[in-house]
């Protein structure tokens, strides 16, 4: 099943889904008190196919013992969950 023609609103919805998935993943595993900042950038483009680029940075308090590698796990989880989310956009 292929994706239907995606609108700008669809792309915004996909981008928000990915952003929220990453943020939720991190916040479930790291106390908000340990986080100085989270920078998540999601670029979603659609011409003939869907292109998704995600970058994320996690800035932790210097006293935090959380593994900064959690951000990579969060991005991987977002990519994995994207496929089932896209089912709502298929023809």
Curated annotation (Swiss-Prot):
Superkingdom field: Archaea
InterPro entries membership: DUF3194, MTH677-like_sf
Similarity comment: Belongs to the UPF0440 family.
Descriptive protein name: Uncharacterized protein MTH_677
Source species: Methanothermobacter thermautotrophicus (strain ATCC 29096 / DSM 1053 / JCM 10044 / NBRC 100330 / Delta H)
């Amino acid at each position: 099943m292929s994706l239907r023609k995606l609108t700008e609103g669809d792309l915004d919805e996909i981008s928000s889904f990915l952003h929220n998935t990453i943020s939720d993943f991190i916040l479930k595993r790291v106390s908000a008190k340990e986080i100085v900042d989270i920078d998540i950038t999601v670029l979603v483009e659609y011409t003939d196919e869907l292109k998704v680029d995600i970058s994320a940075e996690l800035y932790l308090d210097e006293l935090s013992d959380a593994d900064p590698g959690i951000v990579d796990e969060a991005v991987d989880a977002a990519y994995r969950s994207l496929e089932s989310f896209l089912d709502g956009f298929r023809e």
